[in-house]
């Protein structure tokens, strides 16, 4: 894709999200989502092959259905309230329709089927945008309507998402699919806290974006797409591979690393609201995520993958991809836990 075209498309994606974030009118919010969806499709189809075409079509159909449901929710709200203003007091039926539309856009269970398939069919750079930037707009709408959302509906979806995000990733060897299932689980954690403390949800989203962004940047740097190709990067770039493995554990929520902060805070908030069963269930199912990340780390770091290739050293030309953002992102994604006492300002 030529640079001017790419700049125009990326700026449309960004402006679409910004319109959703800043608008106080439902029609403008809907237009922002449509701009964002239509601009992201050329980015997904950057590598023009059948798999990318299929992934883009799946993405388009899902997002178009979600936009239709959103517009239906907006119209129902308009009929009952007579106003287009984005407000916290929505009609219950309109609120349910909008919640389902946003969860479809986010890829929460039971509307999660498109996420792994689309992520697997597109390049790493497109997957990075899909699993980070594209989550901001739907979550901002959920944040704005959080007081009128049906808590039981959201909690059911959250629990299912964390379960499916854990189970789905167990037998995967493709790194993009592993990150897609991880995304489903993280979205589950975010919507679990939505109706109780939306500020913690924003903190969780920031941490998730930092960790996923860093993971994708490191995968792009090493050109790793499978667990086998990741295990071969030990010989080529041992330092970067070790960073990837620590990041994987952080994404799984292992305590000394940054990924533990949002899970800790969400469990704390839920128990403050006298909920015991749900945070226990979320904590247990989060172990599934941690298990497949630990298994990936163990297999890559301490064992040799079965491979027909006897020569483990990859041919490599003298080229380095300059990524100035990587060092600070790696530090934030792994070493933020000591700063947790400062989080008390959120209360």
Curated annotation (Swiss-Prot):
Domain of life the protein comes from: Eukaryota
InterPro entries with a match to the protein in the record: Complex_I_Subunit_2 (IPR050175), NADH_DH_su2_C (IPR010933), NADH_UbQ_OxRdtase_chain2 (IPR003917), ND/Mrp_TM (IPR001750)
Role description: Core subunit of the mitochondrial membrane respiratory chain NADH dehydrogenase (Complex I) which catalyzes electron transfer from NADH through the respiratory chain, using ubiquinone as an electron acceptor. Essential for the catalytic activity and assembly of complex I.
Enzyme class: translocase
Transmembrane segments: 3-23, 25-45, 59-79, 93-115, 149-169, 178-198, 200-220, 242-262, 274-294, 323-343
E.C. no: 7.1.1.2
Membrane topology category: Multi-pass membrane protein
GO terms under cellular component: mitochondrial inner membrane
GO terms, biological process: mitochondrial electron transport, NADH to ubiquinone; mitochondrial respiratory chain complex I assembly
Subunit structure, as described in the record: Core subunit of respiratory chain NADH dehydrogenase (Complex I) which is composed of 45 different subunits. Interacts with TMEM242.
Key words, A-Z: Electron transport, Membrane, Mitochondrion, Mitochondrion inner membrane, NAD, Respiratory chain, Translocase, Transmembrane, Transmembrane helix, Transport, Ubiquinone
Chief localisation class: mitochondrion
Full protein name: NADH-ubiquinone oxidoreductase chain 2
PANTHER family documented for this protein: NADH-UBIQUINONE OXIDOREDUCTASE CHAIN 2
Compartments, as annotated in UniProt: Mitochondrion inner membrane
Gene expressing this chain: MT-ND2
Catalytic reaction equation(s): a ubiquinone + NADH + 5 H(+)(in) = a ubiquinol + NAD(+) + 4 H(+)(out)
Protein family according to the UniProt entry: Belongs to the complex I subunit 2 family.
One function term, GO molecular function aspect: NADH dehydrogenase (ubiquinone) activity
């Amino acid at each position: 894709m030529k640079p001017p075209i790419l700049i125009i498309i990326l700026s449309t994606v960004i402006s679409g999200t910004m319109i959703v974030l800043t608008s106080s009118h439902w029609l403008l919010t809907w237009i922002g989502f449509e701009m964002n969806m239509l601009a992201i499709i050329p980015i997904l189809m950057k590598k023009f092959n059948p798999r990318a075409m299929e992934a883009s079509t799946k993405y388009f159909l899902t997002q178009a259905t979600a936009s239709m449901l959103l517009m239906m929710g907006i119209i129902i709200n308009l009929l009952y309230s007579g106003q287009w203003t984005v407000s916290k007091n929505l009609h219950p039926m309109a609120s349910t329709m909008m919640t389902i539309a946003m969860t479809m856009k986010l890829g929460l269970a039971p509307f999660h089927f498109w996420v792994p398939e689309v992520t697997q069919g597109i390049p790493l750079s497109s997957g990075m945008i899909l699993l980070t930037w594209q989550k901001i707009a739907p979550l901002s709408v959920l944040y704005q309507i959080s007081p009128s959302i049906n808590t039981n509906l959201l909690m059911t979806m959250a629990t299912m998402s964390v379960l499916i995000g854990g189970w789905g990733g167990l037998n995967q060897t493709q790194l993009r699919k592993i990150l897609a299932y991880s995304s489903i689980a993280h979205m589950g954690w975010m919507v679990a806290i939505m109706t109780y403390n939306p500020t913690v949800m924003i903190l969780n989203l920031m941490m998730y974006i930092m960790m996923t962004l860093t993971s994708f940047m490191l995968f792009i740097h090493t050109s790793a797409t499978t667990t086998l190709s990741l295990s071969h990067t030990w010989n080529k770039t041992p330092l970067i591979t070790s960073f990837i493995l620590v990041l994987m554990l952080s994404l799984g929520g292992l305590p000394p690393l940054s990924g533990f902060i949002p899970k800790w805070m969400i469990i704390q908030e839920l128990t403050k609201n006298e909920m015991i069963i749900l945070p226990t269930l979320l904590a247990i199912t989060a172990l599934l995520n941690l298990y497949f990340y630990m298994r990936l780390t163990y297999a890559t770091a301490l064992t040799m993958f079965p491979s027909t290739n006897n020569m483990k050293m990859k041919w490599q030309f003298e080229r380095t991809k300059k990524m100035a953002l990587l060092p600070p992102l790696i530090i934030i994604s792994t070493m933020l836990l000591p700063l947790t006492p400062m989080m008390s300002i959120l209360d």
